Amino acid sequence: MRTLVVDHPLVAHKLTVLRDKNTPSPVFRQLTEELVTLLAYEATRDVRTEPVTIETPVSTTIGTAFTKPTPLVVPILRAGLGMLEGMTKLVPTAEVGFLGMARDEETLDIITYAERLPENLTDRQIFVLDPMLATGGTLREAIKFLFKRGASDVTCICLLAAPEGLAKLEEELSDANVTIVLASIDEKLNEKSYIVPGLGDAGDRLYGIAG
């Protein structure tokens, strides 16, 4: 597993505004989209391509195109949906799948309540969208779900991570071909498993408080 924190003034500025509790939902959504596009630029640095021959108005030349199948983008519901537009603006030909995951309040296990993905993910290059890597439980189960379908190349784009959750992922996925791309690794988790300083509940700030 590899971790990449994107160090760029625009990333730092947009993240600062996202963190501000006074930032309203419409601005929060717009900034999330913009920030994801910046992170996706780095996350797609190793996207698979092949040479293609094209005709310009002047001559024939060799260009670059995505290999087939094209990248698969998988937002984790619901907060991951707020990141989708920022990703597909950069990679508009990508296919999009969905994973709905939540923690069972009684058992505390992560359950999959919805999915719309190809049955066979062998040879697919997959980009998972999940804004907050707190305990790491949801992202870990999402990656395992994809691996069970045959995936072997997964990149996760997150806005923030707590060191505790990141360490747990590294421990369990140390040998896996997984890359985590982040805007920031924050200080810690608090007693409620919120990232500190964090930005609060990303889903609530994107869409309101409906669960």
Curated annotation (Swiss-Prot):
GO MF annotations, alphabetized: GTP binding; magnesium ion binding; uracil phosphoribosyltransferase activity
Catalytic function, reaction form: UMP + diphosphate = 5-phospho-alpha-D-ribose 1-diphosphate + uracil
EC number: 2.4.2.9
Co-factor remark: Binds 1 Mg(2+) ion per subunit. The magnesium is bound as Mg-PRPP.
UniProt key word Transferase: yes
Broad class of enzyme this protein falls into: transferase
Binding site for uracil: 195, 200-202
Protein origin, superkingdom: Bacteria
Cofactor: Mg(2+)
Gene Ontology BP annotations: UMP salvage; uracil salvage
Pathway the protein contributes to: Pyrimidine metabolism; UMP biosynthesis via salvage pathway; UMP from uracil: step 1/1
Pfam family, any one: UPRTase
Coiled-coil boundaries: none
Binding, 5-phospho-alpha-D-ribose 1-diphosphate: 78, 103, 130-138, 201
Family: Belongs to the UPRTase family.
Function: Catalyzes the conversion of uracil and 5-phospho-alpha-D-ribose 1-diphosphate (PRPP) to UMP and diphosphate.
PANTHER family recorded: ADENINE PHOSPHORIBOSYLTRANSFERASE, URACIL PHOSPHORIBOSYLTRANSFERASE, CHLOROPLASTIC
Protein name: Uracil phosphoribosyltransferase
